[in-house]
């Protein structure tokens, strides 16, 4: 009886939530509106105008960085480059996917490149973020870039300084599934609010799916200080943000994969979509078009509105960020994950009336902004532009786990890409270069038209040569790349690796306490900087050599002598080693692990106990909610990213793997099971409560 009263009161309060905040709105169409353009025309006029403001700022920031990099080197090359604006190198940053692991590892790399971070200029690569023109992210990497961009380009340093405040960005001590731990009424109120927000969009006539709920739930960790966690904050609104308008931050690019109508499989032939504050679309021949992202949701034919009324607000920032990490379709492709999908489908249908059931596993963009487009390459099917809806999924489902594609376009004229890889390809959940290999392969496919990527090793060679233990460079000599469609950017590859904190955590870990967040970020700072430059005092200089390499070769300038040493130490020289290795074996993070975890729902959580939803095996009551895949004795509760004694935390990634691999595998199953058992109890309780309210 008491529980029924509590549920009724919370649901009544939830009804007052401003559902309109997430609901797209009708507006008047611009005069002579045509929202689609041919990708063959190059960059959009809006992006070109923005570059006029961004380029002078990146030029100054890069010059400052290179002066520091070559402070002890006698060279005139920087003067030669900066005397002509056309000769100034341009750089981009790409952050891989991998859930919260990717977000925090990417955050550590960004902190190392940000001159606002304490110690980044003295012990890291401070200033590179300020010198970057673009920052691309997919899935968890996009959670990072989106969080920073849409919080007024805040810094990782500033986020950490907020500590564990209730409204601190990235405070996920409790997972988004059970945000208030033992406070049932607040958790129920949160999910009621989310359901109300998504219901408003559905009631306005727009299709909604699991991705809408996913996006809104995650947003409370990205935009905690905004009303309703930023519901109504649009991706295109960055155009009107003074920091972005004035070119004072890199342009964020969100990456997602397109799914062909009537199919379920995503592979290298998938259409890669990019979303900037100006446009959504793809350079791939299967679409070859872009549309104004501000007017998503408008009924169009070949870009022209069918009525005088257009739509604004469909491009909710959280929805764009959630789209890039929408991987629920993978649950439908395996019998092992049927339990997980059934559970999620039931939950979403409970929270939102009229949710799309046929395509509930993807992000649905309907009406299709590219309906009737005439720009598809003649050698490709027109199924994407024939469909009434556009279907998008996690940007890493085609196995291109690093969002290289938008940064490789010749039109963007980049000389170098800093790639942060957070994949889990080895037996101990560390990267093995797979995303680079897939992007390399893609350039030779039909979808690779107009694309080039430098030669990279296979994954076995990558592991055998120890390339996962430190940063490495690819495409160092343009003279060896002349067989490609054009000379691609040089790649500085920065893999997630162990230094002071075991960062090989499961993608399905949904909560991190403050010390874990700091540990992940600090470890990535060290991985990005060769352990605060203690492993190689010349590393900043070597990064400088990599940055100027493309322009140096094209202009036939003389490199500083030290660059030869740098390229010997960091450039992959083409060596292949296919000796079989046990380290390169599948990890345990497959759909079956999710299903077994969800199937093991217990009544250990307070909400589960209240509703008597216990089932499966009871988890140990002494277990802590803030568990982690592998624990670190060196974890710290302070937000300082520079260790007091760097030498004490210097451990090679290879050595760390051999010592932690067995621990990781031993703990993976039990911890994943614990996390999902608690979360599933909460969500079953919420679903049950919502159902009860409708009876």
Swiss-Prot record:
E.C. number: 3.1.1.5
UniProt signal peptide: 1-19
Share an example GO biological-process annotation for this protein. Answer: glycerophospholipid catabolic process
This chain is glycosylated at 26, 72, 83, 115, 152, 171, 207, 269, 335, 379, 480, 504, 513, 532, 556, 573, 620, 626, 644, 648
Where does the record place the PLA2c domain? 28-577
This protein's source sits in the domain of life called Eukaryota
Supply the enzyme class, top level.
hydrolase
Query: What reactions does this protein catalyze?
Result: a 1-acyl-sn-glycero-3-phosphocholine + H2O = sn-glycerol 3-phosphocholine + a fatty acid + H(+)
Q: Where in the cell is it found?
A: Secreted; Secreted, Cell wall
What is the protein name given in its UniProt record?
A: Lysophospholipase 2
């Amino acid at each position: 009886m008491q529980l029924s009263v509590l549920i009724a009161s919370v649901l009544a309060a939830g009804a007052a939530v401003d559902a309109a905040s997430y609901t797209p709105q009708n507006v008047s169409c611009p005069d002579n509106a045509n929202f689609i353009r041919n990708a063959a025309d190059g960059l959009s006029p809006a992006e070109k105008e923005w570059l006029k403001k961004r380029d002078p700022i990146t030029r100054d920031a890069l010059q400052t960085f290179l002066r520091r990099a070559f402070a002890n080197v006698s060279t005139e090359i920087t003067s030669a480059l900066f005397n002509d604006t056309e000769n100034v190198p341009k750089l981009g940053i790409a952050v891989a996917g991998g859930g919260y692991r990717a977000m925090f590892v990417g955050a550590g790399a960004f902190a190392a490149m940000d001159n606002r971070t304490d110690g980044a200029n003295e012990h890291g690569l401070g200033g590179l973020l300020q010198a970057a023109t673009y920052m691309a992210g997919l899935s968890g990497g996009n959670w990072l870039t989106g969080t920073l961009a849409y919080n007024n380009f805040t810094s990782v340093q500033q986020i950490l300084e907020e500590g564990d405040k209730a409204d601190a960005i990235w405070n996920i001590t409790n997972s988004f599934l059970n945000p208030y731990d033992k406070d049932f009424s607040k958790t129920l109120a949160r999910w009621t609010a989310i359901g109300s927000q998504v219901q408003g969009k559905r009631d306005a006539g727009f299709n909604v799916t699991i991705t809408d709920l996913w996006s809104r739930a995650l947003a409370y960790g990205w935009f905690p200080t905004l009303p309703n966690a930023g519901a109504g904050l649009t991706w295109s609104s960055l155009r009107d943000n003074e920091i972005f308008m004035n070119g004072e931050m890199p342009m964020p690019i969100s990456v997602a994969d397109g799914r062909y109508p009537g199919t379920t499989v995503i592979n290298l032939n998938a259409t890669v979509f990019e979303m900037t504050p100006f446009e959504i679309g793809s350079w791939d021949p299967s679409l070859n078009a872009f549309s104004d992202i501000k007017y998503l949701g408008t009924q169009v034919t070949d870009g022209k509105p069918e009525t005088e009324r257009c739509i604004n607000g469909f491009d909710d920032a959280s929805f764009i960020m959630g789209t890039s990490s929408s991987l629920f379709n993978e649950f439908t492709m395996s019998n092992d994950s049927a339990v997980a999908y059934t559970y999620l489908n039931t939950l979403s249908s409970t929270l939102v009336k009229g949710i799309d059931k046929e395509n509930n596993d993807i992000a649905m963009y309907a009406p299709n902004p590219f309906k009737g487009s005439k720009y598809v390459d003649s050698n490709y099917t027109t199924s994407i532009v024939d469909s009434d809806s556009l279907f998008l999924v996690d940007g890493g489902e085609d196995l291109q786990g690093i969002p290289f594609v938008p940064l490789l376009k010749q039109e963007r004229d980049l000389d170098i890409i800093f790639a942060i890889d957070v994949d889990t390809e080895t037996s101990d959940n560390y990267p093995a270069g797979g995303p680079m290999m897939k992007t390399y392969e893609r350039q030779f496919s039909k979808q690779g038209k107009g694309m080039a990527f430098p030669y990279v090793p296979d994954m076995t060679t990558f592991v055998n040569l120890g390339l996962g233990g430190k940063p490495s460079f690819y495409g160092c000599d343009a003279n060896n790349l002349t067989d490609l469609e054009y000379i691609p950017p040089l790649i500085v590859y920065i893999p997630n690796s162990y230094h002071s904190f075991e960062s090989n955590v499961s993608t399905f870990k949904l909560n991190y306490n403050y010390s874990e967040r700091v540990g992940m970020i600090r470890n990535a700072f060290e991985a990005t900087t060769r352990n605060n430059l203690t492993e190689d005092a010349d590393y900043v200089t070597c990064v400088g050599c990599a940055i100027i390499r493309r322009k140096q070769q094209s202009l036939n300038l003389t490199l500083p002598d030290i660059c030869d040493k740098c390229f010997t130490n960091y450039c992959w020289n083409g060596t292949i080693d296919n000796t079989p290795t046990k380290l390169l074996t599948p990890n345990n993070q497959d759909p079956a692990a999710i299903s077994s975890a969800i199937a093991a729902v217990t009544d250990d959580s307070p909400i589960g106990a209240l509703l008597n939803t216990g089932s499966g095996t009871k988890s140990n009551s002494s277990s802590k909610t803030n568990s982690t895949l592998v624990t670190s004795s060196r974890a710290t509760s302070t937000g300082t990213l520079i260790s007091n004694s760097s030498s004490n935390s210097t451990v090679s990634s290879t050595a760390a793997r051999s010592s932690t691999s067995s621990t990781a595998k031993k703990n993976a199953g039990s911890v994943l099971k614990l996390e999902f058992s608690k979360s599933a109890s909460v969500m079953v309780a919420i679903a049950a409560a919502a159902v009860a309210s409708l009876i």
